């Protein structure tokens, strides 16, 4: 048995899933999905196949001919959930699992009408990162494995289902509607995502539109109207955009994150609707994930910095292009303070403040912090400072192109670095970033005239004329400086 991801029952000696066909009926009354998942394997196989599940009620497992396959659901483990072991007959390449989800499924949030902007209809959305896809679909829930999928969602006719995939049609059948989606690019399971509610859309550009409840649609469209320019800037920096569309979904207020980088349909908190586009750095971050995270993916949560450190670096490069180096420096300064707070938070668990972590027996949600984001960013900034921006830009494009649609470990990144930028890791003291707690001595620090102005105001009450044009980032830095 070879389990390379501490947060999955996946056994690397068993066949990988190649495609998923998923059908689900959304039941708002019972807060369940009644579903079936057809897994097509990369090769025909025999013997045990271990899948990740969490609180799924498995009803049957059959092969492509409809013949039952023996299966066993193990007792639940607090972090991993339950292992679904299916015994495959010789030559089995496809299996279908019929099941229903729990009302407490960890990936699903069911909202009452009162929790929505319109107040008339319920709402459902999914959040599968880091290891919650298993509460919706029985599969190999590890980013080491990428799948293509087709999906059919049956929902109340008055509602709209959207997915982080390509739209393939809608059919109304009595009081219900069947929505079809296809994801042609292979994705890690945590990027499966959908939402169901009273939704409307407005086009933003040739490759993007925004979805939202009708009550907030116009505000969302105005706030995010520059997304196409952002997309073009990102392509100049990181190469062609591989996901065809970059649509946005403005979520209800209970969405627990600033944003989630679901491919083709980024989920965003409505708190970004400031009215002046001052908080669109979150959109830049989620867009950057289209290359760093979605295209090149951490092999497990132990290498999360490969997703987030690269993405913060990419986000700030996009901000530089669109809004200038001063704005990027403001965000870097905020990030540095967030990193210092995270390191203090984990003072009793300092190993969690290194980039390369051992998370065996640790829930990735409990280990979540700004460390992989901001310390990872500092590591890449340190490398850029040594080799220079043109050389690092070339390296970054080569890194992305060489690992498209692949999962990567820290060790593989190190090997790639040594091959293409030999000797640089020693110059930046990579050990201090990757394996040592805390902030390395000499880590890059943001500098700009606006940062110096804010620093000079520490402990002072600013004059109205001095701050009349301040952005939220400047106010946040000033207020945090009062601590």
Go through each PLM region and give its residues.
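General structural signal for secondary-structure boundaries
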Residues: 1-4, 18, 326, 409, ...
């Amino acid at each position: 048995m070879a389990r390379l991801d501490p947060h999955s029952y996946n056994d690397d000696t068993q066949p990988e899933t190649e495609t998923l066909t998923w059908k689900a009926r959304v039941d708002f009354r019972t807060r369940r999905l009644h579903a079936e998942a057809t897994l097509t394997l990369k090769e025909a196989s025999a013997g045990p196949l271990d899948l990740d599940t969490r609180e799924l009620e498995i009803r049957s497992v059959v092969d492509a001919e409809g013949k039952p396959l023996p299966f066993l659901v193990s007792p639940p483990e607090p972090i991993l959930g339950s292992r679904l072991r299916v015994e495959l007959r010789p030559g089995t390449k496809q299996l279908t699992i019929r099941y229903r989800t729990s009302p407490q499924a960890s990936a699903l949030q069911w909202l009452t009408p009162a929790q929505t902007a319109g107040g008339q209809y319920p709402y459902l959305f999914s959040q599968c990162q880091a290891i919650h896809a298993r509460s919706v679909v029985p599969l190999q829930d590890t980013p080491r494995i990428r799948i293509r999928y087709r999906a059919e969602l049956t929902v109340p006719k008055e509602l709209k289902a959207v997915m982080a995939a390509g739209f393939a049609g809608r059919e109304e059948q009595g009081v219900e509607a069947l929505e079809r989606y296809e994801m042609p690019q292979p994705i890690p399971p945590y990027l499966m995502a959908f939402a169901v509610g009273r939704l409307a859309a407005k086009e933003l550009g040739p490759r993007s539109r925004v979805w939202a409840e009708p009550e907030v649609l116009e505000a969302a469209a105005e706030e995010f109207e520059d997304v196409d320019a952002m997309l073009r800037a990102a392509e100049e920096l990181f190469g062609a955009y591989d996901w065809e569309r970059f649509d946005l979904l403005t979520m209800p207020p209970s969405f627990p994150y600033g944003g989630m980088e679901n491919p083709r349909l980024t989920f965003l908190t409505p708190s970004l609707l400031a009215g002046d586009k001052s908080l669109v750095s979150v959109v830049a971050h989620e867009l950057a994930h289209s290359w760093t995270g979605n295209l090149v993916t951490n092999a497990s949560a132990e290498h999360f910095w490969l997703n987030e450190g690269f993405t913060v670096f990419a986000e700030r490069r996009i901000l530089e292009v669109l809004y200038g180096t001063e704005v990027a420096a403001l965000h870097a300064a905020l990030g540095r303070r967030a990193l210092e707070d995270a390191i203090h938070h984990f003072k009793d668990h300092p190993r969690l403040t290194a980039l390369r972590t051992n998370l065996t027996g640790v829930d990735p949600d409990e280990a979540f912090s700004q460390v992989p984001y901001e310390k990872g960013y500092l590591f890449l900034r340190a490398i850029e400072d040594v080799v220079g921006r043109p050389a690092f830009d070339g390296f970054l494009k080569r890194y992305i192109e060489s690992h498209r649609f692949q999962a990567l470990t820290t060790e593989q990144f190190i090997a790639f670095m040594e091959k293409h930028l030999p000797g640089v890791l020693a110059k930046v003291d990579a050990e201090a970033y990757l394996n040592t707690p805390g902030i390395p001595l000499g880590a890059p620090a943001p500098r700009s005239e606006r940062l110096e102005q804010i620093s000079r105001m520490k402990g002072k009450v600013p004059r109205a004329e001095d701050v009349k044009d301040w952005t939220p980032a400047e106010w946040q830095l000033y207020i945090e400086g009062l601590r």
